[in-house]
Amino acid sequence: MRLGRRTSKQEEAQIDLTSMLDIVFIMLIFFIVTSSFVRESGVEVNRPTAAHAVSQKQAGIFVAITAANDIYIDKRQVDVERVQATLEHLLLDQPDASLVIQADEHAFNGTVVKVMDAAKGAGVKSIALAAEKP
């Protein structure tokens, strides 16, 4: 018999991960809710491919030009004569917004140039053409 020493099993230390998992899930929900998603124009457009396409960081206004040369701004069809007035109206809300033109690969170049001229006339500072990487 030993005196003074106890021979008992030592309990293993356990780390409670419940609070850490709660924080991780809250952060995940926060990032999902606050992340910004890229808006599309709402019209099916077959974009041409480009070997040196660069992604646009921020886009405010989307203009889609279909193969039938119909022009859509924010999912509404607009006549080519009304493009500048529509863009001027949209620039009142977002004065520094950039413009992304999503032209179908079969759309006429003249229609794209008319939209670009109207955008410059409306005061758009940044214009980008949407393309897909091959």
Curated annotation (Swiss-Prot):
Signal peptide: none annotated. Residues 39-134 are periplasmic. It is a single-pass type II membrane protein. Keywords: Cell inner membrane, Cell membrane, Membrane, Protein transport, Transmembrane, Transmembrane helix, Transport. Pfam families: ExbD. GO terms for molecular function: transmembrane transporter activity. InterPro entries: ExbD. The accessory proteins ExbB and ExbD seem to form a complex with TonB. This is Biopolymer transport protein exbD2.
